[in-house]
Amino acid sequence: MAKKNAKKSKNPPATIARNKRANFDYKFEEKFEAGLSLMGWEVKSIRVGKVNLSESYVFLRDGEAYLFGCTITPLNTASTHVVCDPMRDRKLLLNRRELDKLQGLVERQGYSIVPISMYWRKNAWVKLEIGLGKGKKEHDKRDDTKEREWKIEKSRTMKHAAR
């Protein structure tokens, strides 16, 4: 019998920030993991947790992907010789194949690229999970809310019936 040689990481990726509105406003068909091109003061601020992804999105320009609208608040002890811009556009590090796929779907079929979460990979690399999806209509959001409430109600009745 063949032995599986798969290494399982003991520590799951530590989440830094989540875009909670993303799953409510969009239906994602595919998710990607992208690296971020950051400056030193940004990494220090991220370690403290001063990141906000709520109003951010990803746009494609000149064949490259950029994170726009993500706020990384600089620390008070940040470097004095570097201008700290908390709202600057940050380049995403993706493979050419992934960039081409994203470019084609966004231009032709009207998909949106939205950041879902930011997390640490191997305690050294900041990664951004981005989702490729379409915006939900109002009735889709209501259906999701009804379904979620029905699951809660069903679990309550099963819990009380078991007593």
Swiss-Prot record:
Keywords: Cytoplasm, RNA-binding
Gene3D superfamilies cross-referenced by the UniProt entry: 2.40.280.10
Main localization of the protein described in the UniProt heading: cytoplasm
GO molecular function ontology, one term from the record: RNA binding
Region of interest: Disordered: 135-163
SUPFAM superfamilies: Small protein B (SmpB)
GO annotation, biological process: trans-translation
One GO term describing the cellular component: cytosol
Subcellular location: Cytoplasm
Domain of life: Bacteria
Residue stretches of biased makeup (Basic and acidic residues): 135-156
Similarity comment text for this entry: Belongs to the SmpB family.
Protein's job: Required for rescue of stalled ribosomes mediated by trans-translation. Binds to transfer-messenger RNA (tmRNA), required for stable association of tmRNA with ribosomes. tmRNA and SmpB together mimic tRNA shape, replacing the anticodon stem-loop with SmpB. tmRNA is encoded by the ssrA gene; the 2 termini fold to resemble tRNA(Ala) and it encodes a 'tag peptide', a short internal open reading frame. During trans-translation Ala-aminoacylated tmRNA acts like a tRNA, entering the A-site of stalled ribosomes, displacing the stalled mRNA.
UniProt-listed NCBIfam families: PRK05422.1, smpB
Record protein name field: SsrA-binding protein
